[in-house]
Regions:
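Beta-strand-rich domains and repeat architectures in extracellular enzymes and scaffolds
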Residues: 7-41, 177-179
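Short, Lys/Arg-enriched, disordered terminal segments
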Residues: 1-9, 114, 194, 238-239
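A flexible loop/linker signature enriched in serine peptidases of the S9 family
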Residues: 29-42, 55-61, 75-87, 102-106, ...
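Short loop/turn segments that connect beta-strands within beta-propeller blades
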Residues: 47-49, 90-94, 160-164, 206-209
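Blade-terminus and WD-like Trp-Asp/Gly-His loop motifs, strongest in beta-propeller folds
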Residues: 18-24, 63-70, 109-117, 178-185, ...
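A short helix->beta-strand "capping" segment at the edge of beta-propeller domains
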Residues: 1-13, 48-49, 166-168
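Repeat-solenoid scaffold signature
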Residues: 93-96, 105-107
Length: 248
């Protein structure tokens, strides 16, 4: 048996973020980019039991299947500083078409809130400072998969394709951890925090105004989804437990 070498890991393909809609199957193929200490991502489509590359830029990790003919994704192909573009790409071939540009980096499209309004999400820095060092004064200040989180918050936006208006749903120190669109409304978990992040997050609903759906109280909502018209939560009380241990 051969031992596993670094080159084996660098050539390994990480598949994820599979989405299926209207018979369309799209997923992300990630490969390590050693020189950049990062990953290169490619959107791939499964059609007639064959896999096709949709993108080749190496930066597209998030996307939304618009219909059986096209997908939406965000990127910065023109390398404009502090900017994100929204692209539409036909599944039957052709170049991605830019349909919007935002003066915010790292935007990711979640889907349609209604027929002319999209929901987007991005990680934003609370205070813009030009400095050659970083002051960590929040807990947590770093998280695996996210990088530095100190003085950064995940924010939600809506974008009207007709009026070109970008509206911030959550702002300031509010931090979004999970978001889904269901039945014409935006549901998300998160909390407003400074200095130290709490364990418990509420579930909110946005349909033009914000309302609280579930008050977490003593339970931390890890994830949520909708099944057969019902809201399903995975939550934790953060009580200590061990193998075969009953907390009662």
């Amino acid at each position: 048996m051969k031992s596993v070498e670094i080159n084996d890991l660098l050539s390994y393909h990480f598949y994820g973020n599979l989405k299926v809609k209207d018979g369309v199957k799209v997923f992300v193929d990630g490969v390590a980019a050693e020189k950049d200490n990062a990953y290169e991502y490619t959107l791939k489509c499964v059609k007639d039991d064959k896999v096709y590359d949709l993108t080749s830029f190496g930066k597209e990790a998030g996307f939304y299947i618009e219909n059986e003919n096209s997908v939406l994704f965000c990127g910065n192909r023109k390398n404009i500083e502090k900017s994100t573009s929204l692209y539409r790409l036909a599944l039957n071939g052709g170049e991605a078409k830019e349909i919007a540009r935002f003066d915010k980096p790292g935007m990711n499209v979640l889907g349609y809130l209604n027929e002319n309004t999209l929901v987007l999400m991005t990680k934003e820095k609370l205070v813009e400072e030009e400095s050659d060092y970083e002051v960590f004064d929040e807990i947590p200040f770093y998280m695996n998969g996210q990088g530095i989180t100190n003085k950064h918050r995940m924010h939600l936006y809506t974008y009207n394709l007709d009026t070109k208006e970008l509206v911030c749903v959550t702002e300031g120190t509010f931090d979004v951890s999970n978001a889904k669109i269901h039945d014409g409304a935006l549901y998300y978990t998160g909390q407003n925090w400074t200095r130290k992040q709490a364990l418990y997050e509420n579930l909110y609903k946005y349909d033009g105004s914000v309302s609280t759906v579930v008050d977490a109280k003593e339970r931390s909502i890890q994830s949520f989804d909708f099944m057969d018209g019902k809201l399903v939560l995975i939550a934790s009380t953060h009580e200590k437990y061990g193998l075969n241990e009953n907390p009662k």
